[in-house]
From Swiss-Prot:
Chain intervals with Basic and acidic residues compositional bias: 285-295
UniProt keyword Nucleotide-binding, yes or no: no
Organism the protein comes from: Caenorhabditis elegans
Gene Ontology CC: one annotated term: nucleus
GO molecular function: p53 binding
Organism classification: Eukaryota, Metazoa, Ecdysozoa, Nematoda, Chromadorea
Listed name of the protein: Apoptotic enhancer 1 protein
Location of this chain's protein in the cell: Nucleus
């Protein structure tokens, strides 16, 4: 907008602002409109002005233009002094008729393109900005109504200019909207393409997952097939090794006058089937410690172990410990009958938490005690003891429970055993390779994996009265057996099928009709046990079952201890009478909690009188598991809770201190503590030790004691490394198996003994005595 004002002296308009406005038509025609002050002329001046111009140029311009003009403002040059003075003298007489118009005129303007401004400048000469005096005089003749028209025109033009500006802005917005819409369409197309690609990728992933699952199933199927394919080779290899061992032992016959004391050890846990268990016959010892065998009444019992020699003052050693030629001839008939039953089983009837779990029933005067872990005394001062556990252990009795299946968990007891076996064999294989090896062994037909020990599939576990020489004779007789012997059915009386206190599991009884042994099929008839069949019909007036499902609390306890569920362990333990109950492999909840590293569960079980010396089928105690994991806190709690530091496993006869893993973390601390506990047993605390289990003396030089009794070690390893001379509080002395002794008493016996805790001196020397 341009603001113009008119003013000056008397009778002379002073053009200090815009004096001319050029109107540009759409046809580029230019008209000039004067904006000088309008004075009312006199009659003489009006005639003069009418002579020069008949009409006003502004009115003629409006009549000729059919479209709104475009306004261009031209600035006048500064006025000349002479012209101003002359004009002042000419118009001075007119002052009485006109007055200066000092009202400002507001003229709207707009921008003009440079090309059009240049064209306007070319069309107008340089001096076109100055009107002739005649034209100026003509402007003075405009009527007053024309001023209102000019103002209206200007208002309309301003409105048109505003609308044109708004129109241009709307067109720009429309253009931008079109561009954004096109861009949005492009993005939508791209999104659709990406969505289709995502669906294809999801479909491929789903197909790959299904393929992986099918491959896993196929791999498992291949593993199962390989298991059955490789079973025969492993069985033959084991039989050859056992045959060589039997031949070597038969060659080194021991004099019958010498008595061998078996190595003391807590026997492995075995399943006790109370329904099929029958009492074992007992033989009373005479004053000369001689026993007689009654083949007619008790065929296959433990009475057959001793010879009938009445002339001997000292009984012959157990037949499975030291073979002799006399026993071979004497028991050849019995061995043939016993060898035909490869499926009879031995179970441990002792399930008390205070008694050591054993394979044979203990009765004070019976001969089974001599087999377990006792010493024999004789008149001669010399007593020979075996140097290895294999010389005094009937290995056929160790495999009578259910199978010890291979587990792939890394925190279970079986995984701990795998690592221990790998370390004992000195192999450089990783744990994954060891697992593959164990799986291969299982596919060959083995039900468990224990190095250098036969399995239940390789030899019958019911041969309890055979000597090693008799086993050699049996193996030779099987090889030369004729085909006619294999076709004959061996019918045995029912009383001959039950050997002593041996039991047969349901799985063995169901599969003992026909069995392949060394390529020959042996058939026998087994008396079917009569059982009461429970009907499925509901009795009258009997409460209906609401259909609630209750899980076995023992299974829940074992799984919860392995998974670390303390609440479930507590609820399951409240439903059991003894938290030390084990499964068919001898594994307790304490074993699982230690192998999984759940310290709170271990403490809870120990505080609830869990047996800290419970052994599984391989003789592993919870202390062996903790030592194999190098877990010093758990080792310390088990030792202070009454754990036997001198307990040995059955597979490799290693104590807990020998189970520490050298390549794992925490080896130094665990080894240092266990070495101190091992060496301090019987030395520290004035030589006091505590019985973990009760023991009945089988010979005169042995000492009987109960679980929890306090004993004082007088002398170590004088007669045998595994037998110590101890004294009770009442003054009785005798030989005690050291594997029954603990450095600390169990929690349930501490109040009775008034026990005071003490700390172990941690020695720098880790050598175990």
């Amino acid at each position: 907008m341009v603001t113009t004002s008119s003013g000056g002296g008397i009778g002379y308009p002073a053009n200090n602002g815009v004096t001319q406005v050029s109107l540009i038509h759409s046809s580029d025609s230019v008209r000039t409109v004067s904006t000088a002050p309008i004075y009312r002329p006199t009659s003489s001046m009006a005639s003069t002005m009418a002579h020069k111009s008949s009409t006003a140029p502004f009115i003629s311009a409006n009549q000729r233009m059919s479209k709104p003009p475009v306004r261009v403002v031209a600035q006048p040059p500064p006025p000349h002094p002479q012209a101003l003075s002359q004009q002042y003298h000419q118009q001075n007489p007119m002052m009485m008729y006109s007055a200066p118009n000092t009202r400002p005129h507001v003229i709207p303007t707009m921008q003009v393109q440079p090309t059009m401004a240049a064209q306007i400048k070319r069309n107008n000469p340089v001096n076109a900005q100055f009107q002739n005096p005649s034209e100026m005089i003509a402007d003075y003749g405009v009527k007053p109504q024309s001023v209102e028209m000019v103002q209206r025109v200007r208002a309309v033009r301003r409105q048109v200019a505003d609308e044109e500006t708004e129109l241009r802005r709307l067109r720009e917005l429309e253009h931008e909207t079109a561009q954004l819409q096109n861009k949005n369409y492009g993005r939508e197309r791209e999104l659709n393409v990406q969505g289709s690609m995502l669906k294809e990728a999801q479909l491929e992933l789903r197909n790959a997952s299904m393929r992986a699952q099918s491959l896993n199933k196929h791999l498992e199927e291949m593993y199962r097939r390989r298991q059955t394919a490789a079973a025969a080779a492993l069985v033959e290899q084991r039989k050859m090794q056992q045959h060589q061992i039997l031949l070597a032992r038969a060659a080194n016959q021991v004099s019958t006058q010498e008595v061998i004391r078996p190595r003391a050890s807590v026997e492995p846990f075995q399943v006790n089937n109370t329904q099929q268990q029958q009492p074992s016959p007992q033989m009373m010892k005479s004053e000369e410690f001689s026993e007689k065998r009654d083949l007619n009444g008790q065929t296959g019992s433990y009475d057959a172990i001793d010879g009938s020699g009445d002339h001997q003052k000292i009984p012959t050693e157990p037949s499975y410990l030291a073979p002799c030629k006399e026993n071979q001839q004497k028991y050849s008939e019995l061995s043939k009958m016993a060898s035909t039953d490869p499926h009879s089983n031995h179970s441990s009837p002792s399930t008390s938490s205070q008694k050591a779990p054993t394979l044979i029933t203990f009765s004070p005067p019976s001969f089974e005690q001599k087999i377990n872990s006792s010493t024999m005394t004789r008149d001669s001062p010399f007593v020979e003891r075996p140097t290895s556990f294999g010389d005094s252990l009937d290995e056929s009795r160790l495999r009578s429970g259910k199978t010890d299946l291979v587990s792939l968990r890394s925190d279970s007891l079986k995984a701990t055993k795998r690592r221990s076996w790998a370390a004992s064999e000195g192999t450089s294989m990783s744990e994954a390779e060891m697992i593959h090896r164990l799986l291969d062994e299982q596919r060959r037909g083995r039900s468990h994996f224990i190095p250098q020990l036969p399995t239940s599939q390789e030899e019958p576990s019911a041969i309890t009265s055979e000597t090693y020489a008799e086993e050699v004779v049996n193996s030779e007789s099987k090889q030369v057996a004729t085909s006619s012997d294999s076709t004959n059915n061996l019918e045995l009386p029912t009383e001959q099928m039950v050997l002593g206190s041996d039991t047969t599991t349901e799985e063995d009884a169901s599969s003992c009709s026909t069995r392949s042994d060394d390529g020959q099929n042996l058939e026998m008839e087994v008396a079917i046990e009569r059982r009461t069949v429970k009907g499925i019909l509901r009795r009258p007036n009997e409460k209906m079952n609401k259909g609630r499902i209750e899980f076995d609390p023992l299974a829940l306890l074992l799984d919860a201890a392995l998974e670390g569920e303390l609440d479930l362990v507590r609820s399951s333990a409240s439903k059991l009478t003894d938290v030390s109950q084990a499964n068919d492999e001898g594994i307790t909840a304490l074993h699982n909690a230690i192998c999984a590293g759940h310290y709170e569960i271990v403490r809870f079980l120990i505080e609830n009188d869990a047996d800290v010396n419970a052994q599984d089928s391989d003789g592993w105690t919870p202390l062996h598991c903790a030592a194999s994991c190098n877990n010093l806190p758990m080792v310390r709690q088990l030792v202070e809770g009454g754990g036997c530091v001198l307990a040995s496993t059955l597979s490799d006869m290693e104590t807990p201190v020998e189970k520490c893993e050298e390549d794992e973390d925490g080896y130094d601390g665990c080894l240092k503590y266990l070495s101190a506990a091992h060496n301090s047993t019987g030395s520290i605390n004035t030589g006091k030790v505590y019985a973990a289990y009760g023991y009945e003396a089988a010979f005169e030089d042995e000492l009987s004691f109960d679980a929890g009794d306090e004993l004082t070690v007088i002398e170590k390893d004088k007669v045998d490394k595994n037998w110590w001379t101890c004294e009770k509080n009442n003054g009785e002395k005798g030989q005690v198996p050291r594997t029954y002794l603990a450095l600390y008493p169990s929690l349930k016996y501490r109040k009775k003994l008034n026990f005071v805790m003490f700390d172990l001196p941690l020695e720098s020397n880790n050598n175990v005595e």
